[in-house]
């Protein structure tokens, strides 16, 4: 039996990221097979071009199948990068916003786990028969600072995780997160770029694309 591999996936509003790949969080559905296999996911008889455009903002990522489909693409990319068998089972590691971690944890875990049942799909013409055996969830940003022992020795540290849609802020006192200081602000890069484009349009009557 093939041993499972652990794959970390960042389900961003702007991009999906793993240790070895990154692609826009866009998804375009096609009724028939597209003319190319590049970035094409086939699941449940439907075709999707992964990384096409940008997802409309949805605060609840479990509201539809889009982020699950993007996760399948991320799994395929990681399995291919590691030259692992296409039947390799997977343990997923993912993050959730600091302020909604407890509230969203159960639903997001079930959304990704799918009861650990086998899942069949193809990506870029290669067939995969895998399963998600476990899902481990962590507060966004916190894992990153644990790699910097010099910062952890500070009596107080402010962590700012700047993402596509949100900026997550956490204070650590003597290595321990101070829960009351956690904030998730809708001031990420998407909002920033949209605001810049709007100001340029108003001031210069130019459109940034």
Predicted segments, located by residue:
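Nucleotide/phosphate-binding catalytic cleft detector across ATP-hydrolyzing
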Residues: 1-159, 174-191, 203
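Ser/Thr-glycine-rich phosphate-binding loops at phosphate-binding pockets of nucleotides
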Residues: 162-168
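A short helix-loop
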Residues: 171
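P-loop NTP-binding/switch modules centered on Walker-like glycine-rich loops
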Residues: 196
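A mobile "lid/hinge" subdomain adjacent to the ATP/sugar-phosphate binding pocket shared
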Residues: 200-209
């Amino acid at each position: 039996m093939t041993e499972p591999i652990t794959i970390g996936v960042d389900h961003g509003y702007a991009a999906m990221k793993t240790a070895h790949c990154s692609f826009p969080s866009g998804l375009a559905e096609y009724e028939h097979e597209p003319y190319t296999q590049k970035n094409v996911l086939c699941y449940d008889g439907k075709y999707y071009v992964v990384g096409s455009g940008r997802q409309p903002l949805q605060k609840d990522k479990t509201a539809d199948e889009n982020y699950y489909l993007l996760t399948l693409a991320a799994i395929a990319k990681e399995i291919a990068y590691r030259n692992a068998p296409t039947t390799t089972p997977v343990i997923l590691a993912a993050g959730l916003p600091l302020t909604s971690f407890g509230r969203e944890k159960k639903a997001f875990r079930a959304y990704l786990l799918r009861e650990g049942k086998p899942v069949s799909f193809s990506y870029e013409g290669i067939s995969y028969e895998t399963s998600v055996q476990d899902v481990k969830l962590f507060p966004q940003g916190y894992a990153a600072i644990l790699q910097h022992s010099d910062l952890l020795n500070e009596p107080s540290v402010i962590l700012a995780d700047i993402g596509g849609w949100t900026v997550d802020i956490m204070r650590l006192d003597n290595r321990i997160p101070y829960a009351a200081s956690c904030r998730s602000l809708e001031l990420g890069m998407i909002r920033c770029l949209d605001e810049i484009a709007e100001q340029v349009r108003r001031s210069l009557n130019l459109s940034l694309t």
